[in-house]
Amino acid sequence: MTYVLLGAVSFVFFYLFDVFNIKGKSFLKVSFALIGLITFIYSSYKIAFLGSSIFFHKGIRLISALLFLISLFLLFYSLFLELPFKKTYGEKDYNNGLITTGTYALCRHPGVLWFFFMFIFLFFYTGSTLLLMAGLIWTSLDILYVYLQEKYFFQDMFKDYKKYKKTTPMLIPNLKSIKRCFKTIK
């Protein structure tokens, strides 16, 4: 349970990343992003391979491993490749333009989708019962985090964000957004 809480604390660090991002404090922004990321990866690793587990058939485990890797790639793609990396995560200037194409045409927070699927498939691969609980708790915290981003940060960071909210679902893609995603993905 300690690692579940440690993983939860990483979301506080991610929130502080946004606070210092909007204040233009690049050193603190990067520091809290790295602390949050390292804390989260460490917690996830420990939970995935510790404690009791359920046995799943080898075929389920293999398919789940593949789907986990796809989800992990999509998470990395959405957060670190589609967004301009240096401007988003490194520079002082936070207003780097709103991305509305690719996976960001699918929904406003595609990382939350990939995050959820990543933990579901990792559970079916490892069988870790604690991982299932942690994944659900952390996904709930991720949803709270993106809600807070929308409420307190993104309106100020991106001038067209209100328009984007009207045209793109927050978390659950619809048929129109799925078509727009495939049409604009690079």
Question: Model-derived features: where do they sit?
Answer:
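Membrane-anchoring alpha-helices and their flanking helix-loop junctions
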Residues: 1-100, 118-186
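Histidine-centered phosphotransfer motif of kinases
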Residues: 100-101, 105-113
